[in-house]
Swiss-Prot record:
It is a peripheral membrane protein. It is found in: Cell inner membrane. Gene3D superfamilies: P-loop containing nucleotide triphosphate hydrolases. Part of the ABC transporter complex PhnCDE involved in phosphonates import. Responsible for energy coupling to the transport system. This is Phosphonates import ATP-binding protein PhnC. Residues 3-247 form the ABC transporter domain. It comes from Pseudomonas fluorescens (strain Pf0-1).
Length: 265
């Protein structure tokens, strides 16, 4: 299997229990959508699968490795095989799109090669090809601050496609896109995963998009998995229980501006 969680709990420092006894197995090449109301723990679950955060208790296995039993160096090598798409990609405003996309390989390059790439992009054709898949080839040398929220999200996706990971995790990857573009972008991700046998796991707030594009659906509420089944078996009653006291999201949420985060050195 590619991903496995066994009785995983996550307690934040403020006392909030984000995940409660999660058991989850995902095989190589599977495509899975995680749905649930705001605050259900979807982002926490994805970050745990990405080994970005350590479970408070329980066990996690990623690509055959017990991630938190590895040395820091070994875990860093493991992370280079995992791609994570952020809802708001942390792209410096003045960074050129070509540099942002090529950053997908930083975990696989030496320090010297990475520094050279900051001054002189080393694989312009590769970056252009990744952007072309998302209809953004014309933005290759634009600054990130010149792009819309939806375009920034697509740059983040292009960066992960260029990285070519074995596991692709996407946290609300189309939240700033209109319904048509959101569906088109998810189709691109799904096709890429299928053609390259990549394991794809995405959290989505838009239930209809999840049901339309993913064969397996995991319903998460208050840090617990309420159901895990083929999309064709997801019923209205199951969704009503999952989203009790919540309003189901339409095919894609209203476009909201993204805050571009500048990573600190």
């Amino acid at each position: 299997m590619t991903l496995r969680l066994k009785q995983a709990f996550l307690h934040h420092t403020n006392g909030v229990e984000a995940l409660r006894g999660v058991d989850l197995q995902i095989e190589a090449g599977e495509q899975v959508a995680i749905i649930g109301p705001s605050g259900a723990g979807k982002s926490s679950l994805l970050n745990m699968l990405a080994t970005a955060i350590r479970p408070s208790s329980g066990d996690i296995e990623v690509l055959g490795e017990r991630a938190w039993h590895l040395s820091a160096r070994q875990r860093q090598r493991l992370r280079a095989r995992i791609g994570l798409v952020h809802q708001a990609p942390p792209l410096p405003p003045r960074q050129r799109v070509v540099t942002a996309v090529l950053a997908g390989k930083l975990g696989q390059w030496s320090l010297g090669k990475s520094l050279i790439n900051l001054l002189h992009p080393l694989d312009v054709p590769g970056a252009r090809a990744a952007l072309a898949k998302l209809d953004l080839a014309d933005k290759l040398f634009s600054q990130c601050q010149q792009l819309s929220g939806g375009q920034l999200q697509r740059v983040g996706i292009a960066r992960v496609l260029y990285q070519a990971p074995e596991v692709l995790l996407a946290d609300e990857p189309v939240s700033a896109m209109d319904p048509v573009l959101a569906g088109h972008t998810l189709s691109i991700l799904s096709r890429h995963a299928r053609e390259h046998n990549v394991t794809l796991v995405a959290s989505l707030h838009a239930v209809e998009l999840a049901l339309a594009h993913f064969p397996r659906i995991v319903g998460l509420r208050e840090g617990r998995i309420l159901f895990d089944c083929p999309s064709a078996q997801v019923s209205r009653d199951m969704l009503d229980t999952l989203y009790a006291n919540e309003q189901l999201q339409s095919p894609a949420p209203a476009v909201t501006p993204l805050i571009v985060q500048i990573p600190r050195c």
